[in-house]
């Protein structure tokens, strides 16, 4: 059984960003909330939208920060402190440039890879990077100078379908993660091939 108590989906707030690649983490948390019929509600003390799920008999909180991406740690730290959740009990879902659309991978710890949301969370958790990550592939524009425009752009329909398929599989694997363990969830998710 997993000890995950908080699942966070990273995003920028506002309608203009809702469909951009940088919000892939929030798409995952939204899909998870829908799958368990527990809609997210805004909770200002946690600087985000929150919900509470019973996942495989365990109490799990969901959070989509309403801060901008580079301030995500404020929301994560507020919720973690309030509910006494340790970094290794947190799963952060985020967009990943180094994976292609249609691929999602789980990992524990590591650096921020230039991702401003992860950077701020690590900082606000007392420079502790040892939380779980769900990396949702969005692909790379091929040139470092194009990254900002790329992550703040909307994927074409063909890529969106691949990203959605990977997110749906990640939702299914979250149940495996909670019921069994990280290794089983990783094995299934990492073997996934989009149609």
UniProtKB/Swiss-Prot annotation:
GO biological process: protein quality control for misfolded or incompletely synthesized proteins; rescue of stalled ribosome
Name of this protein: Peptidyl-tRNA hydrolase
Gene name per UniProt: pth
Organism name: Pectobacterium carotovorum subsp. carotovorum (strain PC1)
UniProt keyword terms in alphabetical order: Cytoplasm, Hydrolase, RNA-binding, tRNA-binding
Record carries keyword Cytoplasm: yes
PANTHER family: PEPTIDYL-TRNA HYDROLASE
Major localisation: cytoplasm
Keyword Hydrolase: yes
Family the UniProt entry places it in: Belongs to the PTH family.
């Amino acid at each position: 059984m997993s000890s995950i108590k908080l699942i966070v989906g990273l995003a920028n707030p506002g309608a203009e960003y809702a469909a951009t690649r940088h919000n892939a983490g929030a798409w995952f948390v939204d899909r998870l909330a829908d799958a368990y019929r527990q809609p997210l509600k805004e909770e200002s003390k946690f600087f985000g939208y929150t919900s509470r799920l019973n996942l495989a008999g365990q109490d799990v909180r969901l959070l989509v920060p309403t801060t901008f991406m580079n301030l995500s740690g404020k929301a994560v730290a507020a919720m973690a402190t309030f509910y006494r959740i340790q970094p290794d009990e947190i799963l952060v879902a985020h967009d990943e440039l180094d994976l292609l659309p249609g691929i999602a991978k789980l990992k524990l710890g590591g650096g921020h890879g230039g991702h401003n949301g992860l950077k701020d969370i690590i900082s606000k958790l007392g420079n502790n990077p040892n939380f779980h990550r769900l990396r949702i592939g969005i692909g790379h524009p091929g040139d470092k100078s194009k990254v900002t425009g790329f992550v703040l752009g909307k994927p074409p329909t063909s890529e969106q379908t691949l990203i959605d398929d990977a997110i749906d599989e990640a939702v299914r694997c979250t149940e495996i993660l909670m019921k069994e363990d990280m290794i089983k969830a990783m094995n299934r998710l990492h073997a996934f091939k989009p149609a």
